[in-house]
C-alpha cells in the first residue's frame, strides 16, 4: 500500500533504545550512538518501544537507489544513505547485473542477478508515494520505472503486520530493515549483535506495518546520515568489503 508523505520531521530524528551489552564492540557502538544523540537537536525517544533498536526517521522529499558509487558526504541534499539490495559477487568492476534482483535507479529499470532470498520489494514513486510488496515484484518495478521512481528487491520480513520471515541468517550480527511504522518510513537497526531470530522478534515488538531486510555485515553496513546542523554521522566505519558495495537507498531533503 502506498502512503502519502504529509509529515514534517526533524532532518533526521533518531530513536535510541538501550539494549543488552554483548561485549566491548557492542558497548563501543552503544557509546557512539549515545554521543550522537547528545549532539542532535532535537532527539525523539520513545520509551514505549522495544529496547535494543535504533530507529532513524529521515525527513525527505525524494528517494533514489544510487548505484556503483556511494553518495558523497559533500552532497548536502542527502540526509541518509545505506546499502539496500544484496551484492551478488565481490567484483572489482561495477555492473548492474551484480546487484541481486532487478532494480530501478533514477527511473530506469535494470536487470540484476537472480536471488532466491528476494521475497519482496520496496518502491518509491515520484509522486511521493511508496509500496512494499510481498512476492513477485516485476510489475511493480515496471510501474515505478515508468513513474520515474526507484525500487529494489530484498527479503520481506513483515508485510501488512504479519511476519513472513523468509530469510534465517546464521550467527549473530547487527541487522537492519527498511520499515513503515505508523505511516512513516524508517530504517531500523539492532543496537547490538543479535541472532536474526532475535532481530525479527524485536521488529515484531516494534510493530511496523512492513519491514524489508537491508544488506548488513562488516563493510556492507557502512552508512551515514546528516543532522540538522549539516554534520555527517557514520553509523558503521568503512571496512574491507565496503569497496564491493553496489547500491544505496538514498534519502534527499
Protein language model annotation of sequence segments:
Residues 91-162:
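Active-site-adjacent helix-turn-beta-strand microarchitecture at beta-sheet edges
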Residues 118-120, 172-177, 245-246:
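Short glycine-rich loop/turn motifs
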Residues 21-114, 188-189:
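Zymogen propeptides
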Residues 148-188:
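Flexible, glycine-rich surface segments
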Residues 1-9:
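Bacterial N-terminal signal peptides that target proteins for export
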Amino acid at each position: 500500500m502506498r502512503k502519502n508523505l504529509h509529515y514534517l520531521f526533524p532532518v533526521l530524528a533518531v530513536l535510541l533504545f538501550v539494549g543488552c551489552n554483548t561485549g566491548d564492540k557492542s558497548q563501543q557502538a552503544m557509546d557512539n550512538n549515545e554521543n550522537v544523540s547528545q549532539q542532535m537537536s532535537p532527539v525523539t525517544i520513545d520509551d514505549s518501544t522495544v529496547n535494543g533498536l535504533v530507529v532513524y526517521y529521515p525527513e525527505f522529499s525524494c528517494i533514489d537507489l544510487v548505484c556503483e558509487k556511494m553518495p558523497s558526504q559533500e552532497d548536502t541534499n542527502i540526509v541518509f544513505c545505506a546499502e539496500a539490495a544484496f551484492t551478488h559477487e565481490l567484483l572489482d568492476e561495477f555492473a548492474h547485473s551484480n546487484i541481486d534482483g532487478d532494480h530501478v535507479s533514477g527511473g530506469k529499470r535494470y536487470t540484476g542477478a537472480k536471488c532466491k532470498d528476494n521475497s519482496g520489494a520496496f518502491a518509491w514513486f515520484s509522486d511521493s508515494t511508496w509500496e512494499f510488496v510481498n512476492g513477485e515484484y516485476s510489475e511493480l518495478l515496471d510501474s515505478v520505472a515508468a513513474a520515474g521512481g526507484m525500487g529494489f528487491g530484498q527479503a520481506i520480513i513483515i508485510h501488512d503486520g504479519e511476519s513472513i520471515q523468509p530469510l534465517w541468517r546464521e550467527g549473530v550480527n547487527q541487522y537492519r530493515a527498511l520499515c513503515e511504522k505508523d505511516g512513516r518510513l524508517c530504517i531500523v537497526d539492532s543496537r547490538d549483535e543479535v541472532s536474526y531470530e532475535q532481530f525479527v522478534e524485536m521488529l515484531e515488538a516494534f510493530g511496523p506495518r512492513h519491514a524489508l531486510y537491508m544488506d548488513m555485515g562488516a563493510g556492507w553496513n557502512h552508512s551515514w546520515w546528516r543532522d540538522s546542523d549539516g554534520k555527517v554521522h557514520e553509523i558503521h566505519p568503512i571496512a574491507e568489503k565496503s569497496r564491493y558495495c553496489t547500491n544505496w537507498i538514498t534519502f534527499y531533503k
